Amino acid sequence: MRLLAEDGLPDRLSLDDDLLIEADNLRVLDALPAAAFDLIYIDPPFNTGGRQTRRTLEVEPLVGGTPGFGGRGYARTEVSRSDYADDFDDYLGFLAPRLRRARELLAVHGTLYVHLDYREAHYVKLELDRIFGRECFLNELIWAYDYGAKTKRRWPAKHDTILVYVRDPGRYWFDSDAVDREPYMAPGLVGPEKAARGKLPTSVWWHTIVPTNGAEKTGYPTQKPEGVVRRIVSASSRPGGWCLDFFAGSGTLGAVCAQLDRRYVLVDSNPAAIAVARARLDGR
């Protein structure tokens, strides 16, 4: 993996090594070669209007501490904290030029996944329809989870939306056989052979958030689970193919690509994100 910073960024980037780039992503997108990527996955800021906080915690067993799994007690100690604003006056004005360039960077068989929440998903879909054409809309994926604050004044929002667009609706790559299958909800209705094989996930994905004590936990705010991103990379890229995330955050796409024999380019302007991703990816 090669680390680049904005002050040393060339006008044209070649895809020789995996790249982790600390820079304005629009400048990087202009420097990348066109039609080079099997897959672009982005998880842009959700425009929540607040601040996202990164907390690094140490968790230790403690008799009489907070009840945890199996009734065992534990204590959490905050080691460090950093945050960033998640608030844009003109969210689409910020995102649209990046989406237009993303389309140009996709190979003819390439696919774009845009990870959003309920605040902006419908606006971004209309913009993507304008940029790609409605015929290039492939899927709306729902990642459902049960975590976070509850409210009694409305239905609690417990899902994210992932919009999927292809460069060419007649030529895009989708390998359903490469995706881990999941159990049937009623296996007795499908026969033993199909029940043993499992089924291809539908457009609604039930998947936990990153576990507090999980090996992949970085403490970075908005970190997405490797299991969710692994489905995307497995289905929509080929071994050895190039994948891009220009809102890289904690580097989950890079971690998954390293596991699945894909190449990656990760971009983020936040030094804290680059530090987390670098620590996660060094040596992979």
Language-model region placement:
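Core catalytic lobe of class I
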Residues: M1-R284
